[in-house]
């Protein structure tokens, strides 16, 4: 929604003070290139190696890099998620946690200002979920990115969230820090924190 892949039913979405629901195509594309995505299932191309997945993304967003510059960007992105040694592996050879890390490297390779995470810890064990949550924090600090994290994993929300919004039927019903929401007067909101 934040990159206006789909149309908003109601409300407004502002990025850097610009109402994106009203932007023309070219203006919207200028916003989109500033946003990285980490999809719930990783969304890696099965027929491409890790290197090829990252190269495809980089070439799609940046047309003026030499092959050497592209390779350096790929290595830097993989090093930032601790998976440089997986550069020539196929997605099927990677664990779920490794696929999530590669998906994050793919989001990072375009040097976004904002990263949108869709259920970054979904389908992972508790230890790997915590590692991914901590990696999100590391990425925020190292690359100075803002993060929007969509999650049902309250442990992830506690680790990564400065502000948490709770939605019910598409409406925001609560907003605050983890500690504030944990003590909410609303029993339904508190039920998420048990």
Task: Report each predicted region and the residues it spans.
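Helix-to-loop junction immediately C-terminal to a conserved catalytic motif
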Residues: 3
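Conserved ABC transporter NBD signature motif
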Residues: 11-19
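Conserved ABC ATPase "signature" region
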Residues: 18-19, 67-85
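Conserved catalytic motifs of ABC-family nucleotide-binding domains
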Residues: 111
């Amino acid at each position: 929604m934040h990159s206006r892949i789909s149309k908003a039913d109601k409300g407004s979405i502002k990025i850097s003070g610009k109402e994106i629901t009203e932007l023309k195509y070219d203006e919207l594309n200028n916003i989109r290139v500033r946003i990285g995505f980490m999809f719930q299932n990783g969304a890696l191309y099965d027929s491409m190696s890790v290197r090829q997945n990252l190269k495809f993304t980089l070439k799609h967003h940046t047309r003026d890099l030499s092959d050497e510059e592209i390779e350096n960007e790929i290595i830097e992105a993989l090093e930032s998620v601790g998976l440089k040694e997986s550069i020539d592996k196929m997605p099927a050879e990677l664990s779920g946690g490794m696929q999530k890390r590669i998906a994050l490297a793919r989001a990072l390779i375009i040097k976004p200002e904002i990263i949108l995470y869709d259920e970054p810890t979904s389908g992972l064990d508790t230890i790997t979920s915590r590692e991914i949550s901590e990696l999100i924090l590391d990425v925020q600090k190292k690359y100075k990115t803002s993060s929007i994290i969509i999650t049902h994993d309250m442990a992830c929300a506690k680790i990564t969230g400065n502000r948490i919004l709770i939605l019910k039927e598409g409406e925001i019903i609560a907003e605050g820090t983890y500690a504030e929401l944990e003590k909410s007067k609303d029993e339904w909101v508190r039920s998420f924190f048990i």
